[in-house]
């Protein structure tokens, strides 16, 4: 209540509280209020000042509520604004309960799943302007629907009610086509309702169906876990579809390391190129096999990785889509042997110095012996890797008192056999002038060479 530019006297207001508003308390800034008659005796109000009356009320019914008030005062020259009205709507209390069930726990692509949604108003009041949202997984396509109350919008997936009476229950049925694998669900929730809900914990529910797709099971192996440089190995990749659906456009990514040189590819279906094995469709319980024959070109520890995928359909068990095979490659070792045969007519003395370089590891050996005519001596120098070089420095002496012809034959046996013959005439006797021969031997996978 406000006086504008003039003082007013003996102001009296009447406030009419309708049924549904039960006064619990009230207070005013001036005057006296009679609760029985609804009359507020205010008294005088100076210009530009306000006086107020406040009610604290209990709402005990739903619907539209209107409060009317009017005021009279001496000195009030404008009665046009002496009346006021306040209207508001009182909503009730409801307890909407949602339940969702499906007729299948598991399904396959192409199956129809029936989802049943039940909405119950547990009261105590009617619920108005209800919207129930259905959040369907992308793999569930609504084909048919029916309901016994309200209205279902198949575009927005909303189930709409003007009113659901206290104690009333409604049912919505959705028949959905399954067109995707995975865990598919319908999440249902109360999106809108005019009334306050005393229990929001039962406003949401969901039902799920597990749709299995393919299950590609990949196994990768090598014929030799330990191999030598130059060996030939088989890389075998097996893919099985454990189902239940057909794996469409199945493929395997199998990139071979650089130390494996492909010699031959054998497969029972599809093509293998640039590290990709395109299998195509692989039906339930079918198996595809790939066998790659490759030569090991260098030493080291190498890992092969393979991954199977079916891009057109989900794999319900991706754990077994990958596999790994490891191969440890060493440089092979060969025995280095030398046979020295005396083809001279006299006994000779051989003094042999050997220096072996096995990839930086140096081995030195010295041999000093006499060899009668026509006899041989076998020397075993040890085991060495391919790529080893051996330097032979050989001194051969004439043990006779007179000059003689020194003739001997060296046979080197490693990755291949090489024979070296030496024939020197007029060699002074009694170890005065030995025959000196220096040679370098190379052990290679293609054979032994002498320089």
Swiss-Prot record:
InterPro entries: Chlamydia_OmcB, DUF11_rpt, Ig-like_fold, OmcB-like_DUF11. It holds the Pfam family DUF11. Keywords: Plasmid. Transmembrane segments: none annotated. To ORF5 in pFZ1. This is Uncharacterized protein ORF5B. The lineage of its organism: Archaea, Methanobacteriati, Methanobacteriota, Methanomada group, Methanobacteria.
